[in-house]
Design a protein with these regions (language model features):
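A short helix->loop->beta-strand "cap" motif at the edges of active sites that frequently abuts
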Residues: 124-128
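N-terminal secretory targeting modules
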Residues: 1-39, 55
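Extracellular glycan-modifying ectodomains
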Residues: 1, 52, 97-98, 123, ...
Length: 176
């Protein structure tokens, strides 16, 4: 009798109830999942900052491809490793070492970063790639290495590259 009554009911109202229940289920489940679970199928490629995700047991080693001090023109092995993992999502957290390595040349930096993005798109064609902005540094670091004053300019160029290559850009400058 209940089923027959519902069959005659407003379909839009029933769909709305289902949608609300699914949303509630999603919210409840999302809070219980660890970062390790949330990053299953994703990989972060980066340098020493990225390596901290495994050092401090935040993410599984299968979600992190990192090397301390790595430069954009030295990523062949990391790209091979990412290809083997074949993730659906790739986060790139690179560039801090390259601000100094390129002597503050943002155009050279973008050229090298673009080559990395292109190679990853070829190596893992179905993956969604997200490029993280270079984190800003404290004024103390700028005084020690004035080239770090160019980070904002590097990030602007990086965003332009992402727009041009249709790659997602994550501006993390407000997080620090």
């Amino acid at each position: 009798e209940y089923i027959h009554g519902e069959e005659k009911g407003d379909i839009a109202a029933i769909e709305k109830k289902i949608e609300l229940l699914e949303k509630k289920d999603g919210e409840e489940g999302a809070g219980e999942r660890s970062l390790k679970e949330k990053f299953t199928g994703a990989v972060i490629v980066g340098d020493s900052i990225t390596e901290g995700f495994t050092e401090y047991d935040i993410l599984n080693t299968s979600s992190v491809v990192a090397k301390i001090g790595v430069h954009l023109d030295e990523l062949d092995e990391q790209i091979k490793q990412v290809k083997k993992l074949s993730p659906g999502i790739i986060f790139l957290s690179l560039g801090m070492n390259d601000v100094e390595h390129t002597n503050g040349d943002a155009d050279e930096f973008v050229k090298q970063y673009g080559a990395v993005v292109d190679e990853l798109k070829k190596s893992v064609p179905g993956a969604h790639i997200f490029v993280n902005a270079i984190f800003p540094v404290q004024e103390k670091a700028v005084k020690e290495k004035p080239v770090f004053a160019e980070i904002e300019n590097f990030n602007e160029k990086l965003k332009e590259l992402c727009d041009k290559t249709r790659t997602a850009f994550i501006d993390s400058s407000d997080l620090t």
